[in-house]
Every structure is written in C-alpha cells, then in structure tokens.
Amino acid sequence: MLYSFVKVKTMNYQRALTLTLLALSGVVLSFLPSCSSCSKGTGSADSTALDSANLTLAWDSIVIDDTYYDNPETKRGPSVYVNIAYLYPKGDSALIHLFNRFTFGDSFAQLSPQEAVARYIKEVETEYIYSPDSTEGYTPEDLDKMRSHLELRNKIHYVDSLVISVEKMLSTYFMGAVHGMYGSSISNVDRKAHSVISEGDLFVDGYAADLSKILQRYALSSYGRKTQQELEEKEGIYVSDIAPNDNFTIDEKGLTYYYNLYEIAPYAVGQVKIFVPHEALVGILRPNSLLYHYLPETNQ
C-alpha cells in the first residue's frame, strides 16, 4: 500500500519539495527565548544581546506545537505536524516587517507577527494535508498514517549597533517522500538603514570570481583539508561548485557561508558551512562597505 501511495503522491511531494527549496532560497534548530534587554554581541553563534542603551532591542516570540488534521473534529485522516518558534523584535514596525518577510515570505511582511503565523499555518495545511479526492481507495487506518511535518525556527546569530544577522531554519517531510528536507536561509539587516544587506552592498562589481576562489580556499581550512581533491574525496564537497550564494552570517570575526542540501554536496553530507575572516575580503570590499568597521585599522 505504501508503494502505491508514493506513486500517486509523487506530484504533491515534488511540489512540497519545491516549496521547501524556494523558502530556503528566498529573501530563511535551537530556539532562543525572548529577552527584554541584551548586551553587545560577542560573536558567539547564539548571541542575541546588545549593550548600548539607545540601541537595546526587545524580543518576543510565538511558539506553535500542534497537529492539524484533514478532519479536525475527529482528528483522523491525513495530518501535518507543525512546530514553529518565531522570534521577532518588539516595538519597531520596520524590523517586524523585515522579520516577517525573512521568515514567512514577502506577502507576509505587512502583517502582525500573530497574523503572519496564523496565515502561514493555513498555507501549510493546504500544501501538506491531502485533499479528500486524493485519498479515495484508502482505509481509515491508511489515511491516519499519511503524516507530514514542518518545523520552522529563526535564530539570531549576531547583533551589534550595525547589523542583525538572522538564520531561518526549515525542516519538512511530505508523506511518501524518501526523506525529509532541511536547510537554512540567512538574512542580514543594516540597523541604520533598516534594509537587507546583500553581497552587492559589501563587495565591488564583478566580485563573484574572486569571492569564489576565496570561499574555495577557506573551505579547505574549514574542514582541515590540504587539497581540493582531498576535500572532495574525504568530505564529499564539490569544490568547483562553491560560489557566492548570498547566504551568509555576519559577525565581528567574518562571514560564514551556508550551503544547503544538494548545493555543493550530496544529501548525505548535510549542510556545509565555510567561514571567511574579514581580513581575507579586503581586496574585494566596496568603498564604504559595512565590513570595514570590523577590520583592524592597519587593514583599512
């Protein structure tokens, strides 16, 4: 019965897989609790703090942990388990709109966090719970086993007076799939401009080729390998595929690039992270690039 289900549901799985990949490549699994006062980011991956009195950020969160059914009255039939932990800034509507956009998509930007979460759950139900006309021919027990899941969380990697670096983590499984999908989407906010920071804001025109070489070089050091061949053979990472993807965190030490499943390595390798110190990027920085603020004076 499972095999026939997989065949029937191939198109639905492909759609869900596409949605997952698009969500991760769009404008983003530990959850950070809300905080009302913060200290300056120290560069740790879990930093949520800011110490400056006039730049203090207050945080709030919405947590959803529930299962949604095709038949909510009886709680029977196809279902989707949804776990959402949404951390967002309080008291700054522009930042809230950016966080909504990062986490849920462009069309959610102008909603309140509560409205955004509620609408997102409705969309998840539509995409991950099978409609009745697609479940004909199955017993009630078969339908009860048609379970999908979606977990969505965001995390603050680093905060200071210049930037907020946010990671969105999405994990999905669509019933009938061989395996689930997971990955991260990073967004960086220019705190003064209330705008999203892209590679084009940081680096000179035509930066891609030089940045690719830098990333490939630091991939070796990140994984403790001496040659590209060794990295490919021992780690399964295709060095020639490593290129800028606008998916990076910023902190006071450097940039960490994230590559999701299948980007530069097979599924089994998992997510790949490459750290590049700010000093290695001096040659391709745009004049007045925000990253100059993190360089020692001798390199500026």
Where are these regions (language model features)?
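Compositionally biased intrinsically disordered regions enriched in Thr/Gly
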Residues: 36-300
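Bacterial Sec-dependent N-terminal signal peptides
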Residues: 1-48
